[in-house]
């Protein structure tokens, strides 16, 4: 199983304890609502678990489904892979606010995620995420 398949498996399973094996010890996480990069496996897990709580459970059979009539609203709608990095575009809705964003993920030769960057639009989405993530963290 490659790194992206493992990532999809982790978020589908709703068991984020599997993040331990997927993240490099020195992974760097870039949040759309925090100015400084968050360095290290433990803090990255904290942010990813909080994001999972905010976005809700993923219950669809195909996480890349774009059928808006199925399951929860979070879904990846585009995947671009180049070597050891990927751009995963997603859309979701939180508190009635449409969120469009990308996860930029890079990994090393062992398949461990070394960088995870989240970019979100529009401004209302960033503002809402900031408020909600503060409450969760």
Spans of features found by a protein language model:
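C-terminal and inter-domain tail/linker signature
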Residues: 1-137
